[in-house]
Regions:
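A cross-family phosphate/adenosyl-ligand binding-site feature
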Residues: 1-118, 124-213, 217-244
Length: 244
């Protein structure tokens, strides 16, 4: 599905960094060329060797690393990239990119890229809701970056709220939407209904069916991946189906 596609994963210093190893493995199984960039702080959460083992490519951390064939690496990689995902994106790196600061391999490469760029913030709720962080994210969106809203849940600091990075399966859908499917439904609005329906007989009894809703969810997801603005209306569903 992703053969001949170069996916750049830019990993910053966040506890959620370990989840990107799973995403890298998923992308590799889809035959993508997966390139991983890390900030120095990110290496405190996960070892670069993990990514090198999963992707078969050198994990780039140091701009001045001389242990590989010479090239202006951040420019060479930027030219090859089909999509860049910065995940988890710390408040620090979001601020750097939004204000044009490029002082390491990750930020210089992101600055040099002309492909689609996706940012997935991950941080404490108070940090995420800080007006400065929100202003930086809004600025990135004006510059054409796609921002994935963080999930709401229990955070590593012990708080519960917005700031949790979405699961790798969700991040994968954003990448696939950008590079793996034709955009023949761009500009279309698709409404899909899914799940078991009920027809009342009287205030107590009703007629229903055993629909799981999985087919409707699959159709909605396929439309979304092909560029449509998709909304799904769900009736009672006998099993849990996730839609991204």
């Amino acid at each position: 599905m992703l053969k001949n596609k170069t996916i750049v994963l830019a990993v910053t210093g966040s506890i959620a960094a370990y989840k990107i190893a799973n995403l890298a493995s998923m992308l590799k199984k889809l035959h993508a060329d997966v390139q991983v960039l890390m900030t120095q702080n990110a290496t405190n959460f996960i070892n670069p060797i993990t990514f090198e083992t999963l992707t078969g490519n050198k994990c780039l951390v140091d701009t001045f690393d001389r242990n590989f064939q010479y090239s202006v690496e951040h420019v060479a990689l930027a030219k090859r990239a089909d999509v860049v995902l910065v995940a988890p994106a710390s408040a620090n790196v979001i601020g750097k990119i939004a204000n044009g600061l490029a002082d390491d391999m990750l930020t210089t490469t992101v600055m040099a890229c002309r492909c689609h760029k996706i940012i997935s913030p991950a941080m404490n709720t108070q940090m995420f809701e800080n007006p400065i962080v929100q202003d930086n994210l809004a600025k990135l969106q004006r510059f054409g970056y796609e921002v994935i809203q963080p999930a709401h849940g229990y955070l590593a600091c012990g708080d519960t709220g917005a700031g949790k990075m979405p699961e790798p399966e969700t991040l994968l859908q954003y990448i696939l939407k950008e590079v793996a499917f034709p955009k023949d439904l761009t500009g279309k609005r698709v409404l899909v209904t899914a799940g078991a329906t009920r027809e009342s007989i009287d205030p107590v009894r009703f007629i229903t069916n055993h629909s799981s809703g999985k087919m409707g969810v699959a159709i909605a997801k396929a439309a979304m991946l092909r560029g449509a603005h998709t909304e799904d209306v769900r009736a009672s569903m006998w099993s849990t189906c996730a839609m991204t």
